[in-house]
Design a protein with these regions (language model features):
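Histidine-/acidic-rich catalytic cores in large beta-rich domains
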Residues: 5, 12, 16-54, 73-74, ...
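Low-complexity "stalk/linker" and mucin-like segments enriched in Ser/Thr/Pro/Ala/Gly
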Residues: 28, 59-67
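Aromatic sugar-binding surface patches on proteins
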Residues: 68-76
Length: 214
């Protein structure tokens, strides 16, 4: 309900404001569970395939994605650094680009840097390494440098798998029974919007898989 109300408020603000690629509506942590994400909302005069780049602390850390054509742009921003003035570049189809600063706040009880990582930017190829907990810790995503670029502040636990529709499946944050039985499995996107909680009689823990029929 809280996420639904937030989404309705964001849409109302977009419709009532004069937001453009140069001056977008920026919402950090739009669904309350991932403070290293944001939404950029604005309108374009015609349908455009907008490209977003979250600038890394060095060039190899850039994360870029091009979105399908639309006039109403509601664009997820992934890969922000914590407690940092992140630069996000909005590029239109004609090559016009605008820089937007997305500032994130300090996150308590979260390691900003992995203790050890041994990989390269070429091997990671713009991807993040996701780690999920089995207990009191919280899920995170780390880049080739070991910098945290994705973090859930609610205890979604155990296995995290990509779903066929592009979302993720991860254990619910609602504890059902001790020591680790949760209510079921959540289907969410990487920004943190929860689409469905699949409640499992007796609870869920450790692992799940998506069947061929979904």
């Amino acid at each position: 309900e809280r996420q639904y109300e937030q989404e309705m408020a964001m849409r109302k603000e977009l419709e009532g404001g004069n937001y453009t690629a140069e001056h977008p509506y920026v919402v950090v942590n739009p669904y309350f569970v991932n403070p290293l994400t944001a939404l950029l909302l604005f309108n374009t005069e015609k349908e455009e395939a907008v490209t977003l780049t979250v600038k890394g602390k060095e060039a190899a850390g850039d994360i870029t994605h091009t979105f399908p054509k639309a006039k109403e742009q509601i664009l997820p921003v992934l890969g922000l650094y914590p407690e940092y003035d992140n630069t996000v570049v909005i590029m239109l189809e004609d090559g016009t680009a605008y820089d937007v600063t997305v500032t994130t706040e300090k996150i308590e009880n979260m390691p900003y840097q992995a203790d050890y990582i041994n990989t390269t930017s070429d091997y990671m190829n713009g991807q993040l390494m996701f780690v999920t907990p089995a207990g009191d810790s919280l899920a995170g995503g780390y880049d080739y440098r070991g910098d945290c670029r994705w973090h859930l502040v609610e205890p979604f636990i155990f296995d995290m798998k990509p779903a066929a529709n592009g979302r993720i499946l991860i254990g619910s944050n609602r504890l059902l029974n001790m020591p680790y039985y949760t209510a079921g499995v959540c289907e969410m996107d990487l920004v943190g919007k929860i689409y469905t909680e699949y409640r499992i009689p007796g609870g869920y823990h450790h692992d799940q898989f998506e069947m061929e029929d979904g």
